[in-house]
Swiss-Prot record:
It catalyses: UDP-N-acetyl-alpha-D-muramate + NADP(+) = UDP-N-acetyl-3-O-(1-carboxyvinyl)-alpha-D-glucosamine + NADPH + H(+). The keyword Lipoprotein does not apply. Transmembrane segments: none annotated. GO terms for molecular function: FAD binding; UDP-N-acetylmuramate dehydrogenase activity. This is UDP-N-acetylenolpyruvoylglucosamine reductase. The active site is at 159, 229 (proton donor), 325. Signal peptide: none annotated. Its cofactor is FAD.
Length: 342
């Protein structure tokens, strides 16, 4: 139990794992998984560890997916990219823009690897991965069999996909296929983007605006460890939203397909005067209440306690119960984040 996980999670929480293995190709990943499984150890496959909270020491092998490579196919209607799961997401966004292939600019500066992007169906500023995903290539860990899922088969939802359910432990993502249409359409529905002129705006301007919003509002994990948005934006019924808006008319709300309404978790937390609130070494970020940070050598217990406190306060005031977006990892694998902080 002497391999520190601190360098492998952006929260900077100091727990250990029995073994840590970096896999640079599919075969190395399979070998590491099969070796650990033969020894009866649990196995966790990580990208950049930017969406996990380790609750305790991990009693098994952590495999760091570093499968690289970008292939481009130029078709009349779109560019098709085949991207290794271990590629850094933001670097991919920058690369596609430099090469004149826009479409990912709203997703700039999302931390993590390409392989993690479909698991969460990452999204920001009005765009989700499912908008550009063509397929996801996986390998079945027990057999080494390769499987390609179409975007539809990935069953994408809000911060959700098949990879959080039946594909969670049996498969590893090795590559993601993206389709970037040549007829670029800007998405300018959120934040500062609403001020841009859709008729003249360029992809680079959207990218710059997104980077500006993220860097001014969000803490740098190198300075204060964090895992980005800690909570999901809650999606509530039309009735619940109507009652809440009657009482709090300024609450940001985004009607969804099917009649439900998405609320802004950061706003709900902010209304409870929780910005800057600290428990142990963990704190609510002063600029963006949705982010919990490692202010001062936080222990995982500090983060859990703080998340519980935030959830209670928001629940008591608004009767809306927040769910973590961050994935909680126990000694032998993922555990329910909601149960942990309830």
């Amino acid at each position: 139990m002497n391999h520190s996980l601190k360098p492998w999670n952006t929260f900077g929480i100091d727990h250990n794992a029995q073994h840590i293995v970096c896999a640079e190709d599919e075969q190395q990943l399979l070998n590491a998984w099969q070796h650990a499984t033969a020894e009866g150890q649990p196995v966790l496959i990580l990208g950049e560890g930017s969406n996990v909270l380790f609750l305790e020491d991990y009693r098994g092998t952590v495999i760091i997916n570093r499968i690289k490579g970008i292939e481009i196919h130029d078709e009349p209607d779109a560019w098709y990219l085949h991207v290794g799961a271990g590629e850094n997401w933001h670097r991919l966004v920058k690369y596609t823009l430099q090469e004149g292939m826009p479409g990912l600019e709203n997703l700039a500066l999302i931390p993590g690897c390409v392989g993690s992007s479909p698991i969460q169906n990452i999204g920001a500023y009005g765009v989700e991965l499912q908008r550009v995903c063509a397929y996801v290539d996986c390998v079945e860990l027990a057999t080494g069999k390769q499987v390609r899922l179409t975007a539809k088969e990935c069953r994408f939802g809000y911060r959700d996909s098949i990879f959080k359910h039946e594909y969670q432990d049996r498969f590893a993502i090795v590559a993601v296929g993206l389709r970037l249409p040549k007829e670029w359409q800007p998405v300018l529905t959120y934040g500062d983007l609403t001020r841009l002129d859709p008729t003249t705006v360029t992809p680079q301007q959207v990218f710059n605006a997104v980077c500006h919003m993220r860097t001014t509002k969000l803490p740098d994990p190198k300075v204060n460890g964090n895992a980005g948005s800690f909570f999901k934006n809650p999606v509530v019924s039309a009735e619940t939203a109507k009652a809440l808006l009657a009482q709090f008319p300024t609450a940001p709300n985004y009607p969804q397909a099917g009649g439900s309404v998405k609320l802004a978790a950061g706003w709900l937390i902010d209304q409870c005067q929780l910005k800057g609130m600290q428990m142990g070494g963990a704190a609510v970020h002063r600029q963006q209440a949705l982010v919990l940070i490692n202010e001062d050598n936080a222990k995982s217990e500090d983060v859990v306690q703080l998340a519980h406190h935030v959830r209670q306060k928001v629940g008591e005031k608004f009767n809306v119960w927040l769910e973590p977006e961050v994935r909680f990892i126990g000694a032998s694998g993922e555990v329910s984040a909601v149960e942990t902080i309830s």
